[in-house]
């Protein structure tokens, strides 16, 4: 029996990866220095896995930005706006696709399945695939030559790669995949020729609700690869849920099949018991949760391994995490400030690999060798049970299915009379640039090196500065800027009971953007007002409305590491109940325009269609519960980003927010197209420019977005706003972009007057 890993966190123990990238983008380091740092990190990650005694160590999972972007560039799938014809892609090309450039809009970015990782969407229209290099081969040879590691190259499989892309017609799916197949065959053949004995081909899309026709297409794809390269050592890897067509998947002509026995594990286990497993294949079993940070109950996991052994011989069983460890932090070893009981039940990437080794030893009958580890595991779980953190009432049942007593059509005239806003009102999503000074002020205060009085005075100065800037720009609805917030989830978690925070528990969200998710370890409850002071101060500086800014219950849930002993709906409603108190406090303080952000509501959507309605029901219920009690004149806003929202437009409508803003610009008009087929009759803002790129769009460019949106949405309900918060942008580009945005809105108003 062997152990395997599917992928390792890229960012480094101290976010060295992030720092190297941002230093390069700021022109503080050269390309050579960047590549040298990245190589050092890459090799170090391999050494760590080698020290953890992982038998099959992944290579090629490391990236300079995103692994899907890597595949697109490797296959020459580079939109024409980034390349002159015949050009070879450079590092500049690569980063321009991810981040945009002065002359070209960045490629779209969206969620990686139902996670908080974002990938760059390949654009297949007009693509002429060609192999620009064999990146998995380079990674394999580097590991072999530098460290003597016979690694397991990782490749995103052809079916999933195309399904994650855009710019192809569904009825031409087979033709599109066929155009890439010769390149896949060449990459795999060169790996085999170089001596690779295991090649991981990721096909996570096989756990979604694929059709029988598409499953037949997948079968044909792998038959063609097998015909071209007999006995290629392919491990077809799935994760995040159970496979939809178990019998067909395990019958594919590959050496091994990777199944997730954590997420969707019950269905995979049931299928294994019902249909068995081919005697000529290896089962790579995901038995350690790669997406959450709790230790495994090693005795329960050992029992699962024992159950698997009833159907698969030991020498054909590989133990591994349920998915890439990209989704968890690197190690707990620097978490010195956490409660010892809580720390004892946490396992990040390195600790999960240790658990794998322990389970391998147990399966081999070497219990004496891991006796100490088993006892420590027992003691840690017992201490958690004894702590009492998870006992007591879970949530108020009367919160479920609550809604505002008045319909939107009843509220709308009351709100219009109260707020007296112009047509196409302009606003921002919430945050303004967090400069080095802002971050330094927060850091000094947290360390106790700055008094609370001085900290609050400084924060007020930032708020006053940006209220003045917003008024000078002519924005209609203002925000206080969120300078006191390091992270939109962490900020609230720190002020609610039931949350804990790591010192170094960073994970990659997109590009160099890392987040430090809070840990929900116990029952969540309200303690005191969290946002009232800053918002009320901002409102005192202006006659224009200032929005209160909250993070919604579903986003707090989806962007946290969540306790594993309660249904998610219960935890979501606990958070909603806490937020009702904050909404009430804002309203009582005179803040009657309140934004409850739900950027992560889409990413929690289950991957199988049959499981989605249940999730949407409780997600909508939790959001509505947080604000169902407000006055009819109080205007509730929400914001969402990076998602295929046309899939869930009914649920968005059911949220019953008075105004919703949605990320639009990176989808290059596709979000607007979705409204051609769907009627939406509440306030809505489709982001008119991409805030994830340093590029400043022109007034005309944003005006064109507004014009296009107004062909499918009524002007009387349309708002003008950026795609997302402006926290990560520089001040100069932020002011320039907002100036153009306000000018575009005013120009659009004039055009509407002329038409009228």
Swiss-Prot record:
Catalysed reactions, as listed in the record: 5-methyltetrahydropteroyltri-L-glutamate + L-homocysteine = tetrahydropteroyltri-L-glutamate + L-methionine
Comp. bias (Basic and acidic residues): 399-411
Active site: 692 (proton donor)
PANTHER family assigned: 5-METHYLTETRAHYDROPTEROYLTRIGLUTAMATE--HOMOCYSTEINE METHYLTRANSFERASE
Residues where Zn(2+) binds: 639, 641, 663, 724
Swiss-Prot/TrEMBL cofactor(s): Zn(2+)
InterPro entries assigned: Cbl-indep_Met_Synth_N, Cobalamin-indep_Met_synthase, Met_Synth_C/arc, UROD/MetE-like_sf
UniProt-listed Pfam families: Meth_synt_1, Meth_synt_2
Positions contributing to 5-methyltetrahydropteroyltri-L-glutamate binding: 15-18, 111, 513-514, 559, 603
UniProt-annotated binding residues for L-homocysteine: 429-431, 482, 597
Manner of cofactor binding, per the entry note: Binds 1 zinc ion per subunit.
Taxonomic placement: Bacteria, Bacillati, Bacillota, Bacilli, Bacillales
SUPFAM superfamilies found in the cross-reference section: UROD/MetE-like
Protein name: 5-methyltetrahydropteroyltriglutamate--homocysteine methyltransferase
EC number: 2.1.1.14
Keyword list, A-Z: Amino-acid biosynthesis, Metal-binding, Methionine biosynthesis, Methyltransferase, Repeat, Transferase, Zinc
Pathway: Amino-acid biosynthesis; L-methionine biosynthesis via de novo pathway; L-methionine from L-homocysteine (MetE route): step 1/1
Reported function: Catalyzes the transfer of a methyl group from 5-methyltetrahydrofolate to homocysteine resulting in methionine formation.
Gene: metE
Any Gene Ontology biological process: methylation
GO molecular function: 5-methyltetrahydropteroyltriglutamate-homocysteine S-methyltransferase activity; zinc ion binding
Disordered, as annotated region: 392-411
Family of the protein in this entry: Belongs to the vitamin-B12 independent methionine synthase family.
Broad enzyme group: transferase
């Amino acid at each position: 029996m062997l152990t395997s890993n599917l992928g390792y966190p890229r960012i480094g123990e101290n976010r060295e990866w992030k720092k190297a990238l941002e230093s390069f983008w700021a022109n503080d380091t050269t390309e050579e220095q960047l590549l040298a740092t990245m190589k050092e990190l890459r090799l170090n990650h391999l050494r760590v896995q080698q020290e953890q005694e992982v038998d099959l160590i992944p290579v090629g999972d490391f990236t300079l930005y995103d692994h899907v972007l890597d595949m697109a560039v490797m296959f020459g799938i580079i939109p024409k706006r980034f390349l002159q014809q015949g050009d070879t892609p450079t590092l500049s090309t690569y980063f321009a696709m991810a981040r945009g450039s002065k002359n070209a809009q960045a490629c779209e970015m969206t969620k990686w399945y139902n996670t908080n990782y974002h990938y760059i969407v390949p654009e297949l229209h007009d693509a002429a695939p060609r192999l620009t290099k064999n990146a998995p081969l380079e990674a394999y040879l580097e590991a072999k030559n530098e460290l003597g590691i016979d690694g397991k190259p990782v490749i995103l499989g052809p079916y999933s790669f195309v399904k994650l892309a855009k710019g192809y017609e569904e009825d031409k799916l087979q033709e599109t995949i066929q155009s890439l197949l010769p390149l896949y065959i060449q990459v795999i053949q060169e790996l085999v020729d170089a001596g690779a004995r295991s090649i991981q081909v990721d096909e996570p899309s096989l756990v979604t609700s694929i059709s029988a026709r598409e499953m037949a297409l997948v079968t044909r794809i792998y038959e063609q690869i097998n015909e071209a390269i007999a006995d290629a050592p392919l491990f077809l890897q799935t994760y995040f849920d159970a496979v939809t067509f178990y019998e067909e998947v395990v019958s594919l002509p590959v050496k091994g099949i990777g199944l997730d026995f954590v997420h969707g594990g019950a269905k995979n286990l049931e299928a294994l018991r019902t249909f068995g497993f081919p005697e000529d294949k290896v089962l790579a079993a995901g038995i350690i949760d790669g997406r959450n940070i709790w230790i495994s109950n090693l005795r329960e996991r050992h029992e699962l391994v024992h159950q698997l052994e009833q159907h698969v011989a030991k020498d054909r069983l590989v133990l591994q995490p349920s998915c890439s460890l990209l989704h968890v932090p690197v190690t707990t070893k620097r978490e010195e400030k956490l409660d010892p009981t809580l720390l004892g039940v946490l396992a990040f990437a390195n600790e999960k690999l240790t658990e794998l080794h322990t389970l391998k030893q147990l399966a081999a009958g070497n219990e004496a060798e891991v006796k100490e580890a088993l006892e420590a595991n027992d003691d840690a779980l017992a201490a958690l049970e004894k702590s009492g953190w998870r006992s007591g009432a879970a949530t108020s049942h009367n919160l479920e299915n609550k809604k505002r007593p008045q319909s939107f059509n009843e509220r709308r005239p009351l709100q219009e009379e109260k707020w007296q806003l112009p047509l196409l009102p302009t606003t921002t999503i919430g945050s303004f640039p967090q400069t080095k000074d802002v971050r330094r002020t927060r850091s000094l205060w947290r360390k106790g090196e700055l008094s609370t009085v001085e900290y609050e005075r400084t924060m007020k100065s930032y708020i006053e500065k940006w209220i003045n800037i917003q008024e000078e720009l002519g924005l209609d609805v203002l925000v206080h800027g969120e300078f006191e917030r390091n992270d939109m989830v962490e900020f609230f978690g720190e002020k609610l009971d039931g949350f804990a925070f790591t010192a170094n528990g960073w994970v990659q969200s997109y590009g160099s953007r890392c987040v430090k998710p809070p840990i929900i370890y116990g029952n969540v409850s309200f303690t005191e007002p969290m946002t009232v002071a800053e918002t009320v101060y901002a409102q005192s500086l202006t006659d224009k409305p200032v929005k209160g800014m909250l993070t919604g219950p579903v986003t707090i849930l989806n962007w946290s590491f969540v306790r594993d002993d309660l249904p998610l709906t219960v935890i979501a409603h606990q958070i909603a109940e806490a937020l009702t108190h904050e909404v009430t406090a804002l309203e009582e303080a005179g803040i009657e325009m309140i934004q409850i952000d739900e950027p992560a509501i889409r990413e929690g959507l289950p991957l199988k269609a049959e499981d989605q309605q249940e999730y949407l029901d409780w997600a909508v219920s939790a959001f509505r519960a947080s604000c169902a009690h407000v006055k009819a004149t109080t205007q509730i806003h929400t914001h969402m980003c990076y998602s295929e929202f046309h899939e869930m437009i009914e649920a968005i409508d059911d949220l019953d927010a008075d105004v919703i803003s949605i990320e639009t610009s990176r989808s290059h008009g596709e979000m607007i197209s979705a409204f051609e087929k769907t009627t939406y009759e509440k306030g809505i803002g489709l982001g008119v420019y991409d805030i994830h790129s340093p590029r400043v769009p022109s007034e005309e460019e944003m005006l064109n977005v507004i014009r296009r949106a107004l062909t499918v949405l009524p002007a009387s309900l349309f708002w003008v706003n950026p795609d997302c918060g402006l926290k990560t942008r520089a001040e100069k580009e932020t002011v320039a972009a907002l100036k153009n945005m306000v000018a575009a809105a005013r120009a659009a108003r004039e055009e509407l007057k002329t038409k009228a």
